[in-house]
Amino acid sequence: MKNPCNVIAIIGKPRDQQAIQTHRELYEWLTSEGYQVFIDDRLAAILDEIPQSQFASLVELGKNADLAIVVGGDGNMLGAARILSRFDVAVIGVNRGNLGFLTDLNPDDFKEALKAVLKGKYIEEERFLLEAEIHRHGQIKSHNAALNEAVLHPGQVAHMIEFEVYIDDSFAFSLRADGLIVSTPTGSTAYSLSGGGPILSPSLNAISLVPMFPHTLSSRPLVVDGKRRIKLIVSPENRGTQEVSCDGQVSLPVSPGDEIHIYQSPNVLKLIHPKDYSYYHVLRNKLGWSSKLF
């Protein structure tokens, strides 16, 4: 994070009154502390008591802010991350969602933790994203980024699809399955975990491939080096349309015969945590693991 931190962005979608109140409290407290504060312009109509000059788009916030505070759950963080990762801005989260693997701060007691962060007492880590491209007849038809995962799956009707998997242009395996989850370490505690994938430490430079309901007894999740390029070739015999879903928020249409290229993005999310942050404490707390015996 840039030091000193002068410009702070508050980001989040209109969700419920408690979340809106947290945006309001953050703005009032940070401005009283002397910081220049701007807010996600999606909140302009709701926070109408705040001057319109203090609202800006996510791109503008990413360009100008030293620190971005995302209010909400992991979904809000994922949506913000795909844009903020393009810029040199640190990001921290206030949890107003459910599990909150990426949003550390308690909404009812954020001031002390934020004071320490703003004084330079924090842990910073970089989380890599994936880029997903749909290739058709040698041309890129669509693309997007994902912090958690890129998922190949059928369109609106659930059915089995066939595809081949290549790693660095070397054939790895073919599958008849409901799809494939290609996950980052950040996403290994999300959809990938539900599909039986491994939990990867966030600092690992690795990508996991998790088949979804494969029609075989031998298929298992596979972990590959994070610098490998994944190519999926969709069978031209598949019926209907398929999709690639990025973080469960953006869908890229896929036609039979298309190629899907998935690789590590050059952009990273600069995620910061309070000094007392422990990834394994988060896992134990969120996943309900047993406590120490002695």
UniProtKB/Swiss-Prot annotation:
Keywords: ATP-binding, Cytoplasm, Kinase, NAD, NADP, Nucleotide-binding, Transferase. GO terms for biological process: NAD metabolic process; NADP biosynthetic process. It catalyses: NAD(+) + ATP = ADP + NADP(+) + H(+). GO terms for molecular function: ATP binding; metal ion binding; NAD binding; NAD+ kinase activity. It holds the Pfam family NAD_kinase. Its cofactor is a divalent metal cation. The keyword ATP-binding applies. Its main location: cytoplasm. It is found in: Cytoplasm. Its EC number is 2.7.1.23. The keyword Iron does not apply. NAD(+) binds at residues 74-75, 148-149, 159, 176, 178, 189-194, 249. Involved in the regulation of the intracellular balance of NAD and NADP, and is a key enzyme in the biosynthesis of NADP. Catalyzes specifically the phosphorylation on 2'-hydroxyl of the adenosine moiety of NAD to yield NADP. This is NAD kinase. It comes from Vibrio campbellii (strain ATCC BAA-1116). The lineage of its organism: Bacteria, Pseudomonadati, Pseudomonadota, Gammaproteobacteria, Vibrionales.
